[in-house]
Design a protein with these regions (language model features):
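RNA-interacting cores
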Residues: 1-119
C-alpha cells in the first residue's frame, strides 16, 4: 500500500451543517422544540453547525470521501464516468485515513450572505 499525504485548499466558503441530536429528534418525531431564550449571534449559530474534534474544527472522513465520489461524475476514463448513479470506481482505488479530518486554519469568520441551495 502507498501512503500519500494531500492538502485540500478551498476556493469558496465552506458550508457546514452538522446533523445534531436536536435535528435527529425533530426528524424522527416530527416535533421540533423552540428555544425561546436569547437569540444566538451569527457566530454562535455557525459554531453549532461545525463538526468539532478536541475543540478544533474538522470534517468527517465520510463527508470528504462522498464529495470525491460525487466529483467523479465530472471525470471520465476512456469515455466512461468515474462515478455513475449506481456505482463508483473511486472506493476501489483509495481510502482516507482517519475519522475526523482537521481543518487547519488560523481562524474562521461567518459568511452572512444569503444562500440558495438548488432543489
Amino acid at each position: 500500500m502507498l501512503d500519500i499525504k494531500i492538502t485540500i485548499n478551498g476556493v469558496t466558503p465552506l458550508i457546514c451543517n452538522k446533523f445534531t441530536d436536536k435535528a435527529a429528534l425533530a426528524a424522527t418525531t416530527g416535533v421540533s422544540s423552540n428555544n425561546r431564550g436569547e437569540p444566538l449571534t451569527p457566530h454562535e449559530q455557525a459554531e453549532e453547525k461545525l463538526y468539532m474534534d478536541k475543540k478544533k474544527a474538522c470534517i468527517p472522513q465520510p463527508n470528504i470521501l462522498a464529495s470525491i465520489i460525487e466529483g467523479g461524475r465530472f471525470h471520465k476514463i476512456k469515455n466512461r464516468s468515474v462515478t455513475t448513479m449506481q456505482k463508483s470506481m473511486i472506493p476501489s482505488c483509495f481510502d482516507i485515513k482517519g475519522i475526523m479530518l482537521p481543518i487547519k486554519t488560523k481562524g474562521w469568520e461567518v459568511d452572512e450572505r444569503p444562500v440558495r441551495i438548488p432543489a
